[in-house]
Amino acid sequence: MAKLWGGRFELDSSALLEEFNASIFFDKQLWQEDIKGSKAHAKMLHKIGVLSEEETQEIINGLEIIAQRISRGEFVFNASDEDIHMAIESALTALIGDVGKKLHTARSRNDQVALDFRLYVLKSNKEIVNLLLELMASILAIAKVHTSTIMPGMTHLQHAQPINFGFALVAWACNFKRDVERLLSDYTRNNKCPLGSGALAGTPYGNDRIFLTQELGFDEPTLNAMDSVSDRDFALDMLYSLSMIMMHISRVAEELVLWSSSEFKFISLSDEYATGSSIMPQKKNPDVPELLRGKSGRVYGELMGLLCVMKGLPFAYNKDTQEDKEGVFDALKNVGLCLRILKECLKTMSIHPENMYKMAKIGHLSATDLADFLVRECGVAFRDAHHITGQVVAYAESKGVDISDLSEKEIMGVDSRIKQGVKAVLCLEYSMNARNTLGGTAVTQTCHQIEVLESFVREQMACLQVGRSKNE
């Protein structure tokens, strides 16, 4: 098959080159963006006098027919087409004749692919934001029910201070809030139109790039043509943001694995989102959270792969950047799947408050409250209070009990500076609610945090709905 670029070549491409060079079997995912960009380009060519109104409409009608064929699965993609741009242009010319050959006037595949890929990433950005907001809403719905469910807060995976389960879930939601904010920042920074940049230096046709920008829903055109065709920062931004999402998902998954273990028993995963063992009949394995952890490495790899592709490229287009898409496609697919299944896993899990409370009674979680009591009520310097509290802990351990189980008389017997009323501060409920500063684990503070995050979710959901018309 003759190549659209084959005029100066005497020999046909080898079959091996066609196999090696073709990107059509993965960049065909960009077909909607390619057709959208071509329609806008055709309208712009009419505006600057290259196409007549009749020719413009003929091209647009032809592109719509091709779009219908692709969406119905009737369009055949061939390696000889090289990429989605050539496949659609060849099909258009075969469909409407020589008029189709005019479409590529004042356009290069360099700015064409920069447009298509950017449009795809921006569209995907909105989809991932939507999934994050849905996940946050599910987390917050659970958190609202458990603002008084006491559990052990941990540092170094050791019992530290009592918190409520809702507070722990709010911490998860805060991570995903930052992910949303990061993606929104990416969108604003990258919502610029590269079409009209040509191969690397602009075009001599007087392309109306402002018209293209408005037609395609961008905020503004890119500034420099050479940068426009060589820039893949938007793809790297997406991969970095996806990597951060997966890091946060992986940390949540780690807690789900721990909390569902026999040693914790804080939660039970639904049978719908757990698996069994091929040899041990009693097993119920947390495969979903384990796979969520594992997939984070895959997404990190896609980010590092594209960074390595881009690091040594001279400016303007290089064929190396054909390697930019598969990693992004794969990462988007996997992160989307991870967000959806994590949401369902959380919605269907069973929560065991009694086990959380039982474990909160182990490990002297109210020790800090004893030290604070010594400072506030007994006038003891904090370092001395720390030492005295350590002595009380040692005494409790010698008795085989938690410090909250000691009598007031026993506690006061450890050091003469300990005053009456100390027993009351060792209650887990008191300890949790004593942390009533902004950001603390007290019930009132946890409820406030939930309200703030729910408001954020509502606002961003509304903005997402309003913004769906842009770049779509």
UniProtKB/Swiss-Prot annotation:
Keywords, alphabetical: Amino-acid biosynthesis, Arginine biosynthesis, Cytoplasm, Lyase
Catalytic activity field: 2-(N(omega)-L-arginino)succinate = fumarate + L-arginine
Gene3D superfamilies assigned to the protein according to its UniProt record, in alphabetical order: Fumarase/aspartase (C-terminal domain), Fumarase/aspartase (Central domain), Fumarase/aspartase (N-terminal domain)
A GO term for molecular function: argininosuccinate lyase activity
SUPFAM superfamilies for the chain: L-aspartase-like (SSF48557)
Subcellular location: Cytoplasm
Pfam families from the UniProt entry: ASL_C2 (PF14698), Lyase_1 (PF00206)
Entry's EC annotation: 4.3.2.1
This protein's record includes keyword Lyase: yes
InterPro entries on file: Arg_succ_lyase_C (IPR029419), Argininosuccinate_lyase (IPR009049), Fumarase/histidase_N (IPR024083), Fumarate_lyase_CS (IPR020557), Fumarate_lyase_fam (IPR000362), Fumarate_lyase_N (IPR022761), L-Aspartase-like (IPR008948)
Transmembrane segments: none
Superkingdom in the source lineage: Bacteria
GO cellular component terms attached to this protein's record: cytosol
Biological pathway: Amino-acid biosynthesis; L-arginine biosynthesis; L-arginine from L-ornithine and carbamoyl phosphate: step 3/3
NCBIfam families assigned: argH
Family listed: Belongs to the lyase 1 family. Argininosuccinate lyase subfamily.
Protein name per the record: Argininosuccinate lyase
Source organism (scientific name): Helicobacter hepaticus (strain ATCC 51449 / 3B1)
Lineage: Bacteria, Pseudomonadati, Campylobacterota, Epsilonproteobacteria, Campylobacterales
